[in-house]
Swiss-Prot record:
It comes from Oryza sativa subsp. japonica (Rice). Belongs to the peptidase C1 family. It holds the Pfam family Inhibitor_I29. InterPro entries: Granulin, Granulin_sf, Papain-like_cys_pep_sf, Pept_asp_AS, Pept_cys_AS, Pept_his_AS, Peptidase_C1A, Peptidase_C1A_C. This is Oryzain beta chain. Residues 358-380 are annotated as: Disordered.
Amino acid sequence: MAARAAAAAFLLLLIVGAATAAPDMSIISYNAEHGARGLEEGPTEAEARAAYDLWLAENGGGSPNALGGEHERRFLVFWDNLKFVDAHNARADERGGFRLGMNRFADLTNEEFRATFLGAKVAERSRAAGERYRHDGVEELPESVDWREKGAVAPVKNQGQCGSCWAFSAVSTVESINQLVTGEMITLSEQELVECSTNGQNSGCNGGLMDDAFDFIIKNGGIDTEDDYPYKAVDGKCDINRENAKVVSIDGFEDVPQNDEKSLQKAVAHQPVSVAIEAGGREFQLYHSGVFSGRCGTSLDHGVVAVGYGTDNGKDYWIVRNSWGPKWGESGYVRMERNINVTTGKCGIAMMASYPTKSGANPPKPSPTPPTPPTPPPPSAPDHVCDDNFSCPAGSTCCCAFGFRNLCLVWGCCPVEGATCCKDHASCCPPDYPVCNTRAGTCSASKNSPLSVKALKRTLAKLNTA
């Protein structure tokens, strides 16, 4: 009993601790064979269900997935991920490695996670990499850099269920270079890029390239603020008025020489840099803390930002800003291995890096964007015509209130559609309880059913005047 209580307490701590972490890196699919193998060990079903209930509460009643009939399947996915996290952390505690946690992605299979939250298109850049690189001659570099400490990085944002990571990466580096040049941190609009930047390979929530985002901002003469053009996490029509609100501009952008971590370090020593990585693995999905050394390849699928670098107990790392909200990883960041003797860098971080350039002031402050005109209300539904003289409101039922022989002289209205008109000429019953019990003033589901509701009262029908 004491052991069970201790195990349950451990699980609760695991879930609460993961309220600030999470993604994955082992590309293990959740299929029947994997699920069956995973359920043989680790937390019991009762412990997992208790942890799942707590996780649901921590995540506002559920993840981005509909629960309903999916509830049990979501639980089984959660249980399998819980075992994966538990086993990984047990090994990490022995070796001093990075830790995983049950974050907002904990009820997603790895396939679901990859399909929903990634979005960098990296088949080819819009220009050859390394045409120009201003930091090529730099040799002396600081041992560590963290642009967050300089106020040059905006708070972590959340791209939601939209493959717009490329827009978040590009906007973040533009925010940073603007702060470094002008001294003002202005949060900018990812939604403008999602909806208006259709140049090159950019296609909104279906992915894009940071270089093409920079190119759009240059050709557009600037980009609007997040406050004026807020993020919606869906594709939409470009708002021309807001697209023309050019608040922050850049002069150009440069690509870091590919497959060269030293060149990337030189760039990051001067400003935050947009980078692409492979982020679709299970360990990255559920990452919580520490220097990430998990499994990953170089199939670049996610745009992020390198905002610094450093060393922890002899482990060199990059500080990487993600766009999955502050409850993922280390308050929205991941520290990734650096100098791993692989030219591409960890998860391909040195393969496609670039940064915006800026030397002057921003465009003049634009006039306030006129408000979007309100959507006109839909036309009201037509009245329900009882006869030539009387009608009832839409969504109601005509019931005769006074008749003579087969002729109804006065009509009444029951407040629901498809109602049963009771013989007392004063009440009616909803369609789910169609049997009138006029003496009791109730309506039953069927003749002998014990289920009943209070009968509805009719109102007088409207006299047609036209």
